[in-house]
């Protein structure tokens, strides 16, 4: 579980958003292709489900240190979020 603490669009892309997230014991940066559906302002403060044990990847010159999880609703991504408040760093089982 992660909390989004900052978000901004990746320069030169309509789709990519760079997120700074708190994962409990550290902060990570990730890049997500959700910019056509979410604004950076809508993401700050949200708790999201993410995968943190991935090798870093670079998108348009920006390193991504994880991947957020989303489902699909008629072609639009819907972020997976907890039903109840849980602290950043909580493991998904």
Q: Could you say what each language-model-derived stretch is?
A:
Residues 1-93:
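Phosphate-backbone binding interfaces of nucleic-acid-interacting proteins
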């Amino acid at each position: 579980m992660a909390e989004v603490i900052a978000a901004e669009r990746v320069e030169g892309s309509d789709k990519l958003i760079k997120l700074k997230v708190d994962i409990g014991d550290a902060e990570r940066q990730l890049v997500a292709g959700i910019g056509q559906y979410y604004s950076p302002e809508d993401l700050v403060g949200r708790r999201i489900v993410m995968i943190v044990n991935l090798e870093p990847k670079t998108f348009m010159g920006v390193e991504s240190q994880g991947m957020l999880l989303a489902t699909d609703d008629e072609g639009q991504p819907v972020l997976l979020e907890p039903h109840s408040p849980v602290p950043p760093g909580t493991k998904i089982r």
